Amino acid sequence: MSNTEQLREMAKTLVTPHKGILAADQSPRTMNKQLEALGLPPEAELRRKYRQLLFTTEGLQEYVTGVILHDGTIRNHADDGTEFSDLLIAKGVVPIIKVDKSTVPHTNFEGEVVTQGLDGLADRLQEYYDMGARAAKWRAVFTISENTPTEQNILFDCMTLARYAALCQEAGIVPMVEPEVLFSGSHSLERAEEVTTMVLQKLFEQLQWNNVDLEGVILKSSMVLAGSEWSEQTSAADVAQATLRTFMNSVPPEVPGIVFLSGGQTPQRATENLDAIAELEAQEGGFPWELAFSFSRGLEQPVQEAWQGKDENIEAAQAALIKRLQLNSMADQGTYDPSME
Ligand code: 5MM
């Protein structure tokens, strides 16, 4: 099979119907903040134990096609010495590596950030391929305010995403391109739709300019929501309509799949919105792309609450993960029942 065919096949596998992707790629800094919120010390061993809890969850593979890992996690191992990547591969779960090196302020553009990490990326991708990674993720972040995002900020990050995607495909790795339009802010739903459409149009323009094979790409997107500080929160049906319109106006049909980040919504709200999107899909007789979830906080928040850093809570924490995954798998089919919460 040619490289292109393999990439296309892997991209399709990642968006297998009714399954999602677990985003467990918190940087040590973010993971430490999450530990501290539980009253736990920000220690490497606790971070390892937490990832072990997630990846050893029985039945994980029934609901996820892949797990996104941070560099420190793909190099880490379970108690018995099994590398985390091997543990996932043995379950039929694809290790996905986060390859961006986070954001830095965009010089001369107040209030905006750009994502870094292109230097040495081709070599790093080769190394990750050898460790078993078959997909990679890169996140760009856009803030909505009266004056942002600027055209320059959108262009810079989309050019970077396209370069990263081209390097991934060259290395036999499926790029998961994640332009996150932040939920935080006091913008309306209409403004969120306008910005997300602008960002996605620029992103696909840049991917095409760079001759990236769109059939071998996964889009990781925000849902289109009014800002967290906006006077009224958007109903699930309105989120679904706005999100669909945005994608129809920006995402080429060749793209095999779009997966959602949860973006700071409560786990329940993220699931409810996913369900409304799937219901709309059924009403419309299907979308050109497969849709799925790729939540981090939206899946892990209840797990962390149940765990509390205690070994005796591992079983309860794993049960909380399976429950959240089941609910999202149902939502992906438009059959989520809030009374099951
Ligand atoms: C886990 O968060 C990921 C990485 O964040 P940091 O580098 O800031 O720690 C992030 O890219 C995540 O994969 C997506 O944003 C989805 O997470 P949410 O919580 O929005 O579902």
Predicted regions: what is each one?
Residues 101, 142, 181, 223-225:
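Short, histidine-centered active-site or binding-site loop motifs used for metal coordination
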Residues 1-131, 144, 232, 236, ...:
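Alpha/beta catalytic barrel-like cores
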Residues 183-254:
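Catalytic core of soluble alpha/beta enzymes
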Residues 71, 140, 221:
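Residues that line or immediately flank small-molecule/substrate-binding pockets and catalytic motifs
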Residues 43, 138, 177, 219, ...:
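Conserved, mostly hydrophobic/aromatic
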Residues 67, 136, 175-176, 217, ...:
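Hydrophobic residues within beta-strands of alpha/beta enzymes
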Residues 74-75, 182-184, 226, 300:
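Short, active-site-adjacent cap segments at secondary-structure transitions
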Residues 121-207:
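Helix-rich catalytic cores of soluble enzyme domains
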